[in-house]
Amino acid sequence: MPACARVLDFPGSTLAPAFFDVHIHGAMGHDLMEATPGALQAVASFLATRGVGNFLATTVTAPMDVTLRSLEGLAKLLDRPPVEGQAHAIGIHLEGPFLSHVKRGVHPPASLLEPDIATFDRFFEAAGGYVRLMTLAPELPGAAELAAHATARGVRISMGHSNATAAETRTAMAAGAVSATHTFNAMRPLDHREPGILGVVLTSDELFAELICDGIHTAPEMVKLWWRAKGPERALLVTDAMSATGMPDGEYQLGGFPVQVAEGRAMAGGVLAGSVLTLDRALANFLRFTAAPLDQALRLVTANPAAMTGLQEQVGALAVGRTASLVAVDAAGKLTASVIGGN
């Protein structure tokens, strides 16, 4: 050990890779679709304080010109090298516009589109190839063809904002879909005769599944059900956090529309509009709701999102030669220390 080295000890804590959030729209008063250096820096700096080392900048459905402009701006920002002490935007999650009108949530209906390979290619090129993940409703005409095309271009497909039947869901899986977006939310409910997308998500061993574990989007009992179904290899926690995260209650923006935030709930038109959750709190909530072993729970914010996105050679593990991005957490999942980007 070099003479100048400092030894840091955190008794009772567990060392783990820094967290990876594959579904986040913003924080600290900024929406990532602003695609400005100031917005990205504010979000990335805040995430680092919550133990996040890497994230996918997530879009929301918007008019075509707005989406293209945001993707072009994000691509330029993602071309820059990572900054010490800030979470690294390692790619883009395209959430919309290929979503169901029936399960759109707060995504503006006028900007929703049916799956179209040419439109996707415009998005992909505008984003400089940084689209790593795309949410897609399997039941839409052309969804399977788009899933296969996007998969061939290296984009992982997550099924969500969907009213799909079980058969439609399995068709999307055969075309390349690997995950489910914020399981239970904006998703056809379970039925004992037509299990739908949710039934397939919960019973397919090969599918990953996101969950927003804030106690608002999903009740603790349903978190337990999800955990028992997906287990430590296929479950992953996300925040779906929007610009109000880390800020006081008030009115904020998600994409281009206003969201009212009060007492931990982000609402637009009476519908949940993202969250103000942080990934460290999601981990602590998950442990409290399920009593899962800490080593298994940590996979949900590290190794599993890395595997789902195909980025496991870059993030999600402690390995010699990788940039030092790591966290220490106590037995309850509370963050006790973090080193992000070597700082």
What do these predicted regions represent?
Residues D121, E125-M247:
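Active-site core of metal-dependent hydrolases
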Residues D249, A307, A317-N343:
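C-terminal cap of metal-dependent C-N hydrolases
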